[in-house]
Amino acid sequence: MYKRQDKEIEPVRKKLKHLIVNVSNLKTVFPDIRIRIGQGNTHSSYMGITDSFREAELAIMNRMGENEDTYICYSEDSKSGKTKEEIFDSGLRNEILTYQERMDIEGTLRLVDKVGEKLKPFKYDGKLVYEVFGELVETLRFGMKYSREGRNLFLIEDYKKQYRRIWDYDELFQWIKSDLSRVHQVYMKNIQDEESKPI
């Protein structure tokens, strides 16, 4: 937002909050509607408008752990100072790949939980959550090198789309685990079908 006077911006904020209330009231008719509005900082010139849009996008990324139907203002405090490598290090990555190579789905799911637990204290940092989630998906996909079908069912683009749809941190990790189990079941069924074919 262009910084003219904070007094002039306040009515805009009030109208946005009023919009959220109105949309929330529609939930009785449309129960699947969810809305979050991100607001960037005010800036002293028109040149800052792009920065304000970027900050608004980052505010929306920080939606994990917020209540639904929330108006989220960008804040520098939402940065945890952690890197994705600190949460999802090479040791953890290699462990996941080892379990996948053994086709040990239970071990793989436990390690996905481990990543989720390590990241959970920093779920307010949307950029970090997105980066770690992306790295986890890339690793799981790489671990499916043994399965062309698995790689075709586990597409990065689908995960990025689904990430944008999910609003809750626990739901995010629950979803990736259930999808990973689904892909594993399809793969195991294909193996059984191949083995049962007459020679």
Regions found by a protein language model. Give the residues of each.
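Cytosolic nucleotide-utilizing catalytic cores of signal-transduction proteins
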Residues: 3-199
